[in-house]
């Protein structure tokens, strides 16, 4: 299993609960330039319609391109809580495992700028999210318990 060799957290992050966590497979924290399974690092950002901020960076040691899926488990665990991971490619097994924990893999062209991807995501959040993003937002908010109050106010007729 590939354990991270280094995991850095931003300590002064101001997450007020409105930030969606999004990961980027990036070697330099500026460009998406890695395949998910062989990614040597992830930059994880918090994003909402108005702002974004770096939350953490996870770096891994050398990984072999051997088809061994054990190396995926730790990466997928580290992305739990993210709504998406942007990468240059993602194998079918990794896609299934990511989707099972609610992380949407998003394939982008190698060299896509993280700042531009975040900006596009913010525009989508402001103008109306796509289906996958709307579901991700709902999952992060949890069930709306106010619906029971509305039902109680209507009363029962038997």
Curated annotation (Swiss-Prot):
Keywords: Nitrogen fixation. It comes from the Bacteria. InterPro entries: Di-Nase_FeMo-co_biosynth, DiNase_FeMo-co_biosyn_sf, NifX-like, NifX/NifY_domain. GO terms for biological process: nitrogen fixation. The keyword Disulfide bond does not apply. Gene3D superfamilies: Dinitrogenase iron-molybdenum cofactor biosynthesis domain. It holds the Pfam family Nitro_FeMo-Co. The keyword Magnesium does not apply. Belongs to the NifX/NifY family. This is Protein NifX. It comes from Azotobacter vinelandii. The lineage of its organism: Bacteria, Pseudomonadati, Pseudomonadota, Gammaproteobacteria, Pseudomonadales.
